Structures are given as structure tokens and as C-alpha cells.
Amino acid sequence: MSMNPSTNSPTLASNTSKKLPHINGMYWALVVSSTTLGETAGDFISQTLDFGYGGASAVLLALFVIATILQVLFAKQHAWMYWTTLTLASIGGTTLCDWITRSLGLGYPLGSLTIFISLVATLSAWKWWTRSRDLGAALDKIGESLYWLTILTSSTFGTVLGDMLSKNELDLDGQTIGDTLFGEFVTRHGFGLGGIGFGDTASTVALLVLLAAVAVVTLKTRVSRVSCYWGGIIVTHPLGAAAGDFMTKDDGLHLGNAWATLLLVVVLAAVAVLAYRNNKSHAATLAE
């Protein structure tokens, strides 16, 4: 048996009969809902419940690893397991981003660069292992594990990118630069800690436009559908981070972490029900 699976089709079509949900508009609505929930739930666990960024990251990453193992071991697609794993990746990516940028003191510019390098490495490992442009080829156990590692890394990168776009200064939550592991090193060598400071509203709108641009490229050009898929995944995470902050912070809706998280759980559940009915109707149409 060959170690690296191969496939004849460079499309996403084969995923519908394997372990990934059908890639359509409802899929992306669920992804955006999940990533936005990840931002508010991550802040709720680390800040409101006072787990801290390190403690929250440890708990959430442990849950993510367990969910990933179950997802990989399941022989067939289970939508609830897929979305549970994706949501845990989104929440864990939020707390991991805050731990890297704030607790370690890397700040937004250097933190985003560090996580981007990790994202390129995991995506390259996934592509090398599958030896294909077909996302379906990643569904052996190692390839699927690399897929989920890339999802987690893209969530972490997206969160720090969203924070860097929207925030002007790095909030150290009462710490000083000297309290962090790398803060003094970063500032001493001329790296900034803060972000661009567009604000949550402007960042959310800009990222929505960028996501729409990815959709247009996907539908209207011959660019690889898998490249567009990963581009969409990466864009949805900073969009979720900016939208989540817009819902919770003073310059947005000011709902707070708890109420925003509760609201987004309801939204995610509603979108999931709509997606289930849509996919069921789609399957019934194909069966006729």
C-alpha cells in the first residue's frame, strides 16, 4: 500500500462522499459562525472565567486533540464531530494567540510572523503528504491529522491577524513588558507590539469584502479550488476575531463575553439546523 494517497481529480467534489461536509454557502456560514464563537468563547474562558491564556489554551488544546483523534478514527462522516472539532480549534486558536502575543510578549507583528511561518509549515506538510491538489486525498489518518493541525494553525494566525488589524496597542492585561518572556527582547530589537488600529467595525467590513473576493475568485476563475478553500479558511478566522471583538467590546455592541458567546451558540445551532435540512434536501434531490 502506498504511503501517500493519490487522486485523479483536483477538485473538492470527492469530499462530499467522504468525511468533509459538502462545501457550499452553508458550510462557509457555519465556518464564520464557528470562528466568531471561537473569539468570544476563548475570551470568556480565559478572561471572564479567569483561566488565564496559558491555562485556557492547555485545556482547549487537550479537548481539541481528543476531538481530532475521534474525528480521525471515525470511519464515516459525522457532521457534529467535524463542527465540534472545528469550533474547538477556533476557541483554542483564540486563547493560543493571546498567550503568544500577550503572555509571551511577542506582540502582534512578530507574533503574526511566527504563527504565519507555522501555518506555511503545516500547510506544506499536508500538501507534501497528500501529493495532490485534491483535499479529499488528505483523508487518510496522517493526512487528516495534518488537515486539523492546519485548521488549528490557521485559527491562531487568523486571530492574531484580526487583532493586529483592529487594535492599536497590545493589552498586556495588567502585566508590564518585563513580566513577559520575550517582551523586553522584542522591544529592545525594534519590533513593535501593537497593531494597525483600524478598529473592529472597519476590520470586520474589510475582511467581509476580502472573503467575498475569495468567493468571486473561486467561482469565476480557474484558480485551484483547494487553494481558494484554504484562502477562505484563513480569511474567516480574522473575520471571526474582528466580528467577535465588535460584539463584545465597548466600541462595538458591548454585549460582553458571556452574552455574546450565548448568542453565538444559538446562531451556530440555527445555522447548523439549516445546513442539515439543506444537505438532506440536496441528498434527496440527487436520489431522485
Where are these regions (language model features)?
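Polytopic alpha-helical membrane proteins, predominantly small-molecule transporters/carriers
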Residues: S2-E288
